[in-house]
């Protein structure tokens, strides 16, 4: 493990990650989508007393956090929230027509979907959905429909349910009476904040081979081995939606950051 934490190894991973991001940007630009549906996890934007397993943001626009270019402060999370620097935000376009169609289409297909019409004062969607803007061409005004999938227990869908969801999501998108070109993206995952390379390898194998049966059997206990690992379900959902097209792996980088094995199984891939 010490070798994984060496400066040279970290720099090597950094170079690999930048190269993977460049390839993703090329793929997104080539796809030339008119609207993007992003499957990810809502962080801190559902009311504390109301949490949904599945949800769709259907507002005309929503606030998204953006980098403030301030030096990284590792102690910020331990301070009183009132004394922390406020993240910068910018408004991004949604697509209510597609969002409403997805809600009704999924309900028709057996999925009860919550809808979110906007954010409370001071709230903003974070990098879970904001990452897509790093991939879209600079200056793009492509609208985004956030599809929110809970990663939290006990209101967390099973892997099998997410496979069924992905299939229904595809049908709903295909039934939309529009000439607009719809893109679909999974954001988040794979294993983190403790890396599980065995699980990640199984997931990547399922994504690249199109083995939805195996992805549907991913153990709930293993998926919850670390707080962020359930975000794998985002990928399972999109893989099912994209079937029979399999994912092409761009890169998998286990980015370790401590001797305890903490870190992030960073994964990049494309469908199409």
Task: Give the predicted meaning of each segment.
Residues 1-33, 51-167, 175, 195-272:
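Flexible, D/E/H-enriched segments
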Residues 43-45, 152, 191-192:
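Short, solvent-exposed loop/turn segments at secondary-structure junctions
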Residues 168-174, 182-196:
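A contiguous pocket-lining binding segment that forms or flanks enzyme active sites
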Residues 38-46, 118-123:
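Short, glycine/charge-rich beta-strand/loop segments that flank catalytic centers
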Residues 34-41, 147, 180-188:
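Beta-strand elements within well-structured catalytic alpha/beta cores of enzymes
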